[in-house]
Amino acid sequence: MGLLDARISNRNVLVTSVDNVMNWARLSSLWPMGFGLACCAIEMMATNASNYDLERFGIFPRSSPRQSDLMIVAGTVTMKMAERVVTLYEQMPEPRYVLSMGSCSNSGGPYWHHGYHVLKGVDRIIPVDVYVPGCPPRPEALIGGLMKIQELIRMEGLGISRQDALKKLAGKRVDPQQVIDQVRKSATA
């Protein structure tokens, strides 16, 4: 028995709920999959560099949707790319989260009015949990969005649904399934 064992043996009981343990584990090990489509992808890559050290937050980027629990959509989503975004989203295991990064991903950006080929926001095809504004947003803004995702995870639990947690964080959302169906119909027409 060493000196360390004596200190630990006095405090070896932790009282908490299963929700708190599960949420702590999930928010402390986010595995985002970056889906970089335009200028915002450069800022997303800069955020993953050593200057910002996302690993201190427990964030480890992954390249496969099957190993990710967070999808970062960064950049302009075109109508042709929309179906692939949905496919990647559906390949992610539950619970899964989506962060929309940049004006183009949030609302169509500068292509909103005249761009017939640009999706007017990724939330029309998949449910978005956190929006990061900017054109392109700075790495600090993306880190702020990631911290919002962690806050959302902390609020979720066995008794609280994601919908209730999202209502606490933000306003109402668009029903994504209806828009997915509309995009698929327009793509086949």
From Swiss-Prot:
[4Fe-4S] cluster binds at C39, C40, C104, C135. Its cofactor is [4Fe-4S] cluster. Gene3D superfamilies: 3.40.50.12280. It comes from the Bacteria. Its EC number is 7.1.1.-. Coiled coil: none annotated. It comes from Chlorobaculum tepidum (strain ATCC 49652 / DSM 12025 / NBRC 103806 / TLS) (Chlorobium tepidum). InterPro entries: NADH_UbQ_OxRdtase-like_20kDa, NADH_UQ_OxRdtase_20Kd_su. It catalyses: a quinone + NADH + 5 H(+)(in) = a quinol + NAD(+) + 4 H(+)(out). Keywords: 4Fe-4S, Cell inner membrane, Cell membrane, Iron, Iron-sulfur, Membrane, Metal-binding, NAD, Quinone, Translocase, Transport. This is NADH-quinone oxidoreductase subunit B. GO terms for cellular component: plasma membrane; respiratory chain complex I. NDH-1 is composed of 14 different subunits. Subunits NuoB, C, D, E, F, and G constitute the peripheral sector of the complex.
